Amino acid sequence: MKRRVVVTGLGAVTPIGNDVESFWNGVKEGKVGIGPITRFDTTGYKATLAAELKDFVAKDRMDPRTARRMEPFSQYAVVAALEAVENAGLKMEEEDPYMVG
């Protein structure tokens, strides 16, 4: 049996856009997501540039209590996945959980 994978929805949390629309607009405009590190003092480090997310507020896009219990990278993944599910028009309660994901 040959299995197929079908991409039906997109989600993005990136240094040039925190959703698919702003990410794609950033790509088309030639935006660069790399800049000076702002999350901590880089004095004493060789690296001073990074691709940091800007203006990302997890509690605006997912349950605030859940967001508080997650590391930032997990928040990024969950928010992107939620956007992809929404973008696909999936209603998970109507789907077989063993067939989608």
Label each PLM-derived region with a short phrase.
Residues 1-101:
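Conserved "HGTGT" condensation-loop signature of ketosynthase/thiolase-family condensing enzymes
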